[in-house]
Amino acid sequence: MAPKKDEKPATRAATQEAGVEATAKAEAKPKAEKAAKKAKKEPAKKAAKEPKGDGEKKDKKKKSAVETYKLYIYKVLKQVHPDTGISSKAMSIMNSFINDIFEKVATEASKLSRYNKKPTVTSREIQTAVRLVLPGELAKHAVSEGTKAVTKFTSG
């Protein structure tokens, strides 16, 4: 097919003129419209920047959460001996001690539930595990305190 003669030829000059006209139209827009558009864009940018700024701070502060018993050890110490302090090294040792005992009791309770072919570790398995892991009088006190705690939890 032959090109129609009525069509304007697409030349480099024609496309440049179209680009100049588009730029002139953009410049001809009132300043109020541009200011309004900027005002609309700026809050979005600020909102986007603020969480990012906070995010950077959070990234710096964010560490893996290590759960310890230090606060609870300190509270019990103050209940028993209000005028006594504890060094950080002693606190670390106490925390390790509690973690070790917890692991031993949990392992023993898990074994007991497997022996009984039960999928759930109940308070009964925990109680038996405490009796097996802790010696004599300490086991009796631990069982009575545990029973008291479970009763308090279930009733209230």
UniProtKB/Swiss-Prot annotation:
PROSITE patterns per the UniProt record, alphabetical: HISTONE_H2B
Biased composition (Basic and acidic residues): 1-10, 24-58
SUPFAM superfamilies the record matches: Histone-fold
Record cross-link Glycyl lysine isopeptide (Lys-Gly) (interchain with G-Cter in ubiquitin), residues: 152
GO cellular component: nucleosome; nucleus
Residue list for modification N6-acetyllysine: 40-41
Record note on modification: The N-terminus is blocked.
SMART domains: H2B
Subunit comment: The nucleosome is a histone octamer containing two molecules each of H2A, H2B, H3 and H4 assembled in one H3-H4 heterotetramer and two H2A-H2B heterodimers. The octamer wraps approximately 147 bp of DNA.
UniProt protein name: Histone H2B.2
